C-alpha cells in the first residue's frame, strides 16, 4: 500500500502526500513501496522533489516473518540490481512504524542494491523499528551514498538487537542512525 506499489525504471517527481494514513505488511512508504528489477538486469529509478507531510506509515503483522520489513517515508524497499537515486525529498511531521529496516526516507536496500540520497531531509518525524534497523534517513542499506541530508526526528529501536550470523553483506549499514 503506497501511491506506487512497485516501480521498475521509473522517474517520479514533484509529488506531495499530506495527512495520509498508509498501512500494509511490508515494502511500504507514502510514495513507492518497492523499487524492483526485471529479469535481473540493472535498473535505475529516480525520485525527486517529493514531500510527505503529517502522515502515518505503519506495518501490520499477522505473524509472517517478512511483515513489517522495509518501511520508509519516500521508498520502502530497493531490490537487488537496482540503482535508486532520491534527491530533494522530505518527510515532515510523520510517524513511521515497522519491525525491521525502518527509515525516515528509505526503509531498506537489499543485497546488491545501490542507493544514493542527496539533499533530502527528515524533519520532526518519529521513526520506530520494533525489532532492529531504525534510521532517521535509512533503516538498512547495502551500498549507500548520502550527501547533504539531515535528520531532526526521533529514532527508536528495540532495546536489544543482534545481527543474525552471516547476514551482513559487505559495504552494509546495519543499525546505524543517520
Language-model region placement:
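Predominantly extracellular beta-rich ligand-binding scaffolds that present long acidic/polar faces
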Residues: 1-178
Amino acid at each position: 500500500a503506497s501511491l506506487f506499489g512497485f516501480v521498475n525504471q521509473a522517474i517520479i517527481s514533484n509529488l506531495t502526500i499530506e495527512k495520509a494514513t498508509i498501512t500494509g505488511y511490508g515494502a511500504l512508504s507514502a510514495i513507492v513501496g518497492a523499487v524492483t528489477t526485471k529479469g535481473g538486469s540493472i535498473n535505475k529509478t529516480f525520485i525527486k522533489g517529493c514531500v510527505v507531510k503529517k502522515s502515518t506509515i505503519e506495518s501490520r503483522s499477522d505473524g509472517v516473518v517478512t511483515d513489517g520489513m522495509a518501511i520508509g517515508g519516500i521508498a520502502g524497499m530497493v531490490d537487488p540490481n537496482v540503482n535508486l537515486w532520491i534527491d530533494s525529498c522530505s518527510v515532515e511531521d510523520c510517524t513511521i512504524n515497522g519491525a525491521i529496516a525502518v527509515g525516515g526516507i528509505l526503509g531498506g536496500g537489499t543485497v546488491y542494491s545501490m542507493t544514493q540520497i542527496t539533499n533530502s531531509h527528515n524533519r520532526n518525524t518519529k521513526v520506530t523499528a520494533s525489532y532492529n534497523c531504525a534510521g532517521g534517513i535509512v533503516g538498512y542499506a547495502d551500498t549507500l551514498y548520502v550527501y547533504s541530508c539531515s535528520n531532526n526526528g526521533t529514532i527508536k529501536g528495540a532495546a536489544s538487537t543482534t545481527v543474525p550470523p552471516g547476514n551482513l553483506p559487505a559495504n552494509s549499514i546495519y543499525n546505524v542512525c543517520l
